[in-house]
Amino acid sequence: MAAAAGDRASSSGFPGAAAASPEAGGGGGGGGALQGSGAPAAGAAGLLREPGSAGRERADWRRRQLRKVRSVELDQLPEQPLFLAAASPPCPSTSPSPEPADAAAGASRFQPAAGPPPPGAASRCGSHSAELAAARDSGARSPAGAEPPSAAAPSGREMENKETLKGLHKMEDRPEERMIREKLKATCMPAWKHEWLERRNRRGPVVVKPIPIKGDGSEVNNLAAEPQGEGQAGSAAPAPKGRRSPSPGSSPSGRSVKPESPGVRRKRVSPVPFQSGRITPPRRAPSPDGFSPYSPEETSRRVNKVMRARLYLLQQIGPNSFLIGGDSPDNKYRVFIGPQNCSCGRGAFCIHLLFVMLRVFQLEPSDPMLWRKTLKNFEVESLFQKYHSRRSSRIKAPSRNTIQKFVSRMSNSHTLSSSSTSTSSSENSIKDEEEQMCPICLLGMLDEESLTVCEDGCRNKLHHHCMSIWAEECRRNREPLICPLCRSKWRSHDFYSHELSSPVESPASLRAVQQPSSPQQPVAGSQRRNQESSFNLTHFGTQQIPSAYKDLAEPWIQVFGMELVGCLFSRNWNVREMALRRLSHDVSGALLLANGESTGNSGGGSGGSLSAGAASGSSQPSISGDVVEACCSVLSIVCADPVYKVYVAALKTLRAMLVYTPCHSLAERIKLQRLLRPVVDTILVKCADANSRTSQLSISTVLELCKGQAGELAVGREILKAGSIGVGGVDYVLSCILGNQAESNNWQELLGRLCLIDRLLLEFPAEFYPHIVSTDVSQAEPVEIRYKKLLSLLTFALQSIDNSHSMVGKLSRRIYLSSARMVTAVPAVFSKLVTMLNASGSTHFTRMRRRLMAIADEVEIAEVIQLGVEDTVDGHQDSLQAVAPTSCLENSSLEHTVHREKTGKGLSATRLSASSEDISDRLAGVSVGLPSSTTTEQPKPAVQTKGRPHSQCLNSSPLSHAQLMFPAPSAPCSSAPSVPDISKHRPQAFVPCKIPSASPQTQRKFSLQFQRNCSEHRDSDQLSPVFTQSRPPPSSNIHRPKPSRPVPGSTSKLGDATKSSMTLDLGSASRCDDSFGGGGNSGNAVIPSDETVFTPVEDKCRLDVNTELNSSIEDLLEASMPSSDTTVTFKSEVAVLSPEKAENDDTYKDDVNHNQKCKEKMEAEEEEALAIAMAMSASQDALPIVPQLQVENGEDIIIIQQDTPETLPGHTKAKQPYREDAEWLKGQQIGLGAFSSCYQAQDVGTGTLMAVKQVTYVRNTSSEQEEVVEALREEIRMMGHLNHPNIIRMLGATCEKSNYNLFIEWMAGGSVAHLLSKYGAFKESVVINYTEQLLRGLSYLHENQIIHRDVKGANLLIDSTGQRLRIADFGAAARLASKGTGAGEFQGQLLGTIAFMAPEVLRGQQYGRSCDVWSVGCAIIEMACAKPPWNAEKHSNHLALIFKIASATTAPSIPSHLSPGLRDVAVRCLELQPQDRPPSRELLKHPVFRTTW
């Protein structure tokens, strides 16, 4: 029979069915062995028996099915069915009675599913039992080996359903068999099981908890021995759904399950349906995932990192959220448990989330909840319950508190720490372990650490460092300092000195800094404590100094302390910036104090030596010398910091050091120059920084150093009567540039120096160009020295022309060519440049020489160069020997002039006149005079040059040049008194221009500047600013806007204007004029000539000569001369100008006015639109008056009726009764809340229709009742003061019996939500109208520091016309703590309808006015769709909706049918970040509201 059954299974069409089916897996007696040993023989036997025994087999099959049904109803035998086949003697294949065979077959049906047989099976039975076991092995092996997984999966799914019949065969798809199977399932399975199975099948494979097993594989024996039926056996027996059955050769522990991460335990989720006849519901499944996404090594590394991280638990800011802080008070992160995310934005499993899970919740690293992406509600609740129980257990310790209070009275803090430790050691180990953990950083506390104690409260110990961070958090929130555990007031005031104190207020900290000669520990400790009191670096902790810098930092530590120096090496740039701020404070204070003691000759501890030093005019090397030396060493390192704010802080420290450092002697200057040299070298590298702000600031810093005592970095500038001589100005900077010759492969150093050289030549031309004459002859350097300076810089640039870095080579070539163009006034110098180029052997020699000769052709000195250098050297020497006359300077209207003569071919022919057409053709962009400052720290005089013609773009086309001409008025010699008026506006520097063309912004600025200048100093019809610039050829690569060429008429006016007298320096006939002029005169000459064209430039301007050398070098870095609109300067970033030193920059104002005309026009239109909107809403109907509800001025608006008990003081007693059902009647109910109801009402005396809101204030406890009464009073008084057309108005309020009655005006149209439910979604015009009125009302509320917090359709009421909207229901409204947007007291409160609430409110974060703006966007969606946002009507669980909104990364979907304007308003309102949402007043300026007027 068994053979026949197996035969039928064999013929089913499944591959390997004889082995996979239960009958084939082990039949009765020899039949099973026969089938297990050879499938062909079994198939042959089946074919022989099939025709004659079909009817008998069908009857036997039915009997077996009925027997199985009965076996399900009764508890099955625990042990006998499993081992019946092994214990019974071998029986023949044709057994006379079917029961033993059926029992054996039934037993064999469990074996393939249960996995491999126990190892002791062969020993418990004879040889034939061993054969049966082998047969079963072969039958179980075939599905795993020969059969593919897809074929085995259906069988596994059928056998996995443990609630089905144990002996149910794997039947085929015959109709009658399928029908019987469904009936059996329906009769034997409860309804809840059906549902649970369907859910499990939809969910996919489940994770089964592995059963603990022994090495000998004895768990199968235990399963067989325990009478647990299908519950335990079924968990191990069926293979997981969709997975392959285990191979029998493997150990029992080798079941096919998903690999786990080390140490992660699995929770069993499969239920136990039948256990002792009981049916139990399924257990709740835990959250999915639970596996670490990292390798075991990476997982261990991350866990260890979290356990060492300097993070701090600041507070629980919401139901399921924490605020986590770092060492810096600005680093705060919000961690949300459940969604498992953090505000840091670093993705899943960030260090802050792991900190909460491992240290706050104290999970084990092997806990599966640690690595789950989401947690279920019950898991979150369990974590928080354990957390709160741990915290409360630390607070409730009265006996220990009592003991330690006595101890604290009798001992100092050290004794207190030891006594508390000894007391806690007597308690149980778990609590003791809890007591020894700091509640802020959640790490253990050691006796050697600095600890503090909550003296008035819970008596818990905390780290001193952690408590300082908590104190800073309290200070920033403007809250009193309390214990983070018990919330009691903190007695100690050690943590509240956070304000920065001035040097006068805290001289002790300065003296501590000034004593490096005694580095004993007590001094260092007191020094650090004093520094903490001023700048509070304590919450940054002790930072580790890298080993490579320990030797370098050792002298720093001796001067400034370990804490400050350690913070300079912090990985957090905020910490480094704060450390530099404190360093600046300490250095300036130390230098100021030392200078004050020395200059004042005061006595004291070291007064003798300081006074002696002061008498000799030198600074104190014992005090200020070490401070300056250590500070310069620090700055040479920190100035290389890549963070811009840290770099700015370093430059501020440099300025603070220099302005308080006196320098009186040459020896002090040399020492200061030596100390500053590494700092300047570091800044020079920054001059070529990729960040344009950094490069601009670096160049501006060095330029301030070049200005010497006239700049912001003047030595001893802030010291009264210092008389410092400075560090050398331009000469010192030149020594820094040329002293350390940068290696050719270090392109950053080369490029930084070249960028600075480019600016130096433009900013200080009088320092380098021999032909520029200074007015201050006594302070001016000889022209030979300037000539040597220029040649040294050009030699440096020439060395880098062939540099492999393209930008270095281009900038070098540009500097060389631009300098050559500037020295065309002195042909000898120009010839020297040509000679230097010839000797360089550059690969660019041919091209560079061609350009130099083209420049010579333009100014007509080419023949001089061709005649030879010898003919011009003598003339050049004569030119250098000439002294600028002083008489002409005294009579000149300008401070000095630059003269050049126009030379003929032999330098002998000189023309004294020229036509205006010739002048216009020969105007040059270099003819610009600019102010500067000398090396001797005096401001440089202005410069006058005469125009000269030249081609700016030296390519094949001679017309491809651009000329920039700035005309200016010429003043007669009698106008000399105007000189002080001009010079008084001037800054310290003059900026001649960069050789590439000026940017359009610069041109516009100069245009405005010269318009103003001309209007002040001349008649408006004489001159006009003219830009002369021709377009480049089409082949040029330069794409810049070019102004148009002036007409000849304007140029002739310019020539006429220059006929007045001017002063020229005509020292020698051999000196060349710019382009034309008188050549034979010597000495001073006043030449009123037509051809004399010059350009005096107002002192404050910064010019760009529009000179384009070639397209190949024109595309250079713009960083060397930034545009005026985005320029970053030392003054704007570092220096703080005092009011008396601040200068009025009218040019800047004009430029701003020019740039903002369009913006101001738009803003004016928007303000006008806003004014119209407010005016339209200003008028409203008069509010009906109810006599009994009127109160006099100064009285409380709430009127207490006579029958109300006198338990509510502060209200107005009723002069006339106004009681329900007497003076007013209550109508139908129109609203219902948790503690309030809203009704229609009528005043009996006047017939006025009203809406009355009745709120009961009676609560269970007196404290709760007081809170309710106070909230109601606040709402009523708030509404009593509001008066706006879009805010609901209140007629009055009474207190009667146990209710407050709020009488508000009747809005017959009902709420927006009511209209939407009745009439459907609004048209867009209606939505716009209502939205505008809503924004008007909110703008009024926000201006009165009120946030509504419950804006939704149900709280927006419409009048009887449908045109007026009013905001109602201020039960959730609150007054802001201040006029600021943020209000800390509102965090954690969940008020209002969830679907309309902003995400930050649901997350428990701080919120303000912007939460109402978010609700406006939600109201737009509701009015446009007639349903709330987020599909809220589909969420029956409000917690699920809260989670959805709080964890949303996108705004709710906006209806697609909205117009772009209204859609833009909704998008602006629904910005996820509160700071990105515009205020309601700004939204009223949107064009969508203006188009409807």
Swiss-Prot record:
**Outcome of altering residue 1393 to E?**
Loss of kinase activity and autophosphorylation
Q: What is the effect of changing residue 1402 to A?
A: Loss of AP-1 transcription factor activity and reduced ability to activate CHUK and IKBKB. No effect on NF-kappa-B activity or activation of MAP2K1, MAP2K4, MAP2K7. Loss of binding to MAP2K4
Compositional bias of type Low complexity: which residue ranges?
A: 1-23, 36-46, 140-156, 235-256, 411-428, 512-527
Entry keyword annotation includes Transferase: yes
UniProt keywords (A-Z) are:
Acetylation, ATP-binding, Kinase, Magnesium, Metal-binding, Nucleotide-binding, Phosphoprotein, Serine/threonine-protein kinase, Transferase, Zinc, Zinc-finger
List N-acetylalanine occurrences by residue: 2
Q: What's an example of a GO molecular-function annotation for this chain?
A: protein kinase activity
According to the UniProt entry, which residues carry Phosphoserine? 21, 142, 270, 287, 292, 295, 502, 526, 915, 999, 1024
User: Which biological processes are named by the entry's GO terms?
Assistant: apoptotic mitochondrial changes; camera-type eye development; epithelial cell morphogenesis; eyelid development in camera-type eye; JNK cascade; morphogenesis of an epithelial sheet; positive regulation of actin filament polymerization; regulation of cell migration
Composition skew (Pro residues), residue ranges: 89-99
UniProt biased composition (Gly residues): 24-35
Residues bearing PTM Phosphothreonine: 280, 1381, 1393
InterPro entries, sorted? ARM-like, ARM-type_fold, Kinase-like_dom_sf, Prot_kinase_dom, Protein_kinase_ATP_BS, Ser/Thr_kinase_AS, Znf_RING, Znf_RING/FYVE/PHD
List the Pfam families hit by this protein, alphabetically. CEP104-like_TOG, Pkinase, SWIM
Active site annotated at which positions?
1350 (proton acceptor)
* Its job: Component of a protein kinase signal transduction cascade. Activates the ERK and JNK kinase pathways by phosphorylation of MAP2K1 and MAP2K4. May phosphorylate the MAPK8/JNK1 kinase. Activates CHUK and IKBKB, the central protein kinases of the NF-kappa-B pathway.
Question: What is the protein's name according to its record?
Answer: Mitogen-activated protein kinase kinase kinase 1
Provide the species name: Mus musculus (Mouse)
Q: Which gene encodes it?
A: Map3k1
